[in-house]
Amino acid sequence: MKVRSSVKRMCDNCKVIRRHGRVLVICTNVKHKQRQG
């Protein structure tokens, strides 16, 4: 899980979603997991 000020999709499988007021990126590739913080 990377914590970034700006989350971006890194590949076609990445999805940008909002959970509990946080912006997250979930992906089949574990290295692409990000959250905004």
UniProtKB/Swiss-Prot annotation:
Query: According to the UniProt record, which cysteines are disulfide-bonded?
Result: none
**Which Pfam family, just one, is annotated for this protein?**
Ribosomal_L36
Question: Per UniProt, which keywords does this protein have?
Answer: Ribonucleoprotein, Ribosomal protein
According to the UniProt entry, its GO molecular function terms are: structural constituent of ribosome
Q: Name one GO biological process term.
A: translation
Q: What PROSITE patterns does the entry give? A: RIBOSOMAL_L36 (PS00828)
Q: Does this entry carry the keyword Phosphoprotein?
A: no
Identify the GO cellular component terms for this protein.
cytoplasm; ribonucleoprotein complex; ribosome
Q: What is this protein called?
A: Large ribosomal subunit protein bL36
